[in-house]
């Protein structure tokens, strides 16, 4: 699914499902399209159907990763046993928000509250 910037009237985003795109074309951000608008009787919302790409938008160019990140990624070793490890521990809390649970455990009958 996706959304079309629909600039007629109150200028909003119009939902469309990928099945509504004609000829199986994969749309990209910036593509110009033609479509029909339908009203869903159940939800009362409009959506686009019979979506055709009129012309392709500008190709998106991915920004290169910053040098500091590239250098950091090169230095990571996943199987280094001597690397520092982080382990987060927290004490359990009782139902009354007290720290931990009592060491004494009572045997209770099912369905009996004391």
Curated annotation (Swiss-Prot):
SUBUNIT field: Component of a multi subunit autoregulatory ribonucleoprotein complex (ARC), at least composed of IGF2BP1, PABPC1 and CSDE1. Interacts with STRAP. Part of a complex associated with the FOS mCRD domain and consisting of PABPC1, PAIP1, HNRPD and SYNCRIP. The interaction with PABPC1 is direct and RNA-independent. Interacts with EIF4ENIF1/4E-T.
GO terms for biological process, alphabetical: stress granule assembly
Family matches, as Gene3D superfamilies: Nucleic acid-binding proteins
Function: RNA-binding protein involved in translationally coupled mRNA turnover. Implicated with other RNA-binding proteins in the cytoplasmic deadenylation/translational and decay interplay of the FOS mRNA mediated by the major coding-region determinant of instability (mCRD) domain. Required for efficient formation of stress granules.
Residue numbers carrying Phosphothreonine: 77
Recorded family membership: Belongs to the UNR family.
InterPro entries according to UniProt: CSD, CSP_DNA-bd, NA-bd_OB-fold, SUZ-C
Glycoprotein keyword on record: no
Domain CSD residues, every copy: 1-51
Pfam families: CSD, SUZ-C
Locations listed in the record: Cytoplasm; Cytoplasm, Stress granule; Cytoplasm, P-body
Organism: Cavia porcellus (Guinea pig)
Protein name per the record: Cold shock domain-containing protein E1
Annotated Gene Ontology cellular component terms: cytoplasmic stress granule; P-body
Keyword RNA-binding set for record: yes
UniProt keyword terms in alphabetical order: Cytoplasm, Phosphoprotein, Repeat, RNA-binding
Recorded superkingdom: Eukaryota
Annotated ranges, domain SUZ-C: 64-105
One GO molecular-function entry: RNA binding
């Amino acid at each position: 699914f996706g959304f079309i910037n629909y600039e007629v009237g109150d200028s909003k985003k119009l939902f469309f499902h990928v099945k509504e795109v004609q000829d199986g074309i994969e749309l990209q951000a910036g593509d110009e399209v033609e479509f029909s608008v339908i009203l869903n009787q159940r939800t009362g919302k409009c959506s686009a159907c019979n979506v055709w790409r009129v012309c392709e938008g500008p190709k998106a160019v991915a920004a290169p990763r910053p040098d500091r990140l590239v250098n950091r990624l090169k230095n990571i070793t996943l199987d280094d046993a001597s690397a520092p490890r982080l382990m987060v521990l927290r004490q359990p809390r009782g139902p009354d928000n007290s720290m931990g649970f009592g060491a004494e455990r009572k045997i209770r009958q099912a369905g009996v509250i004391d």
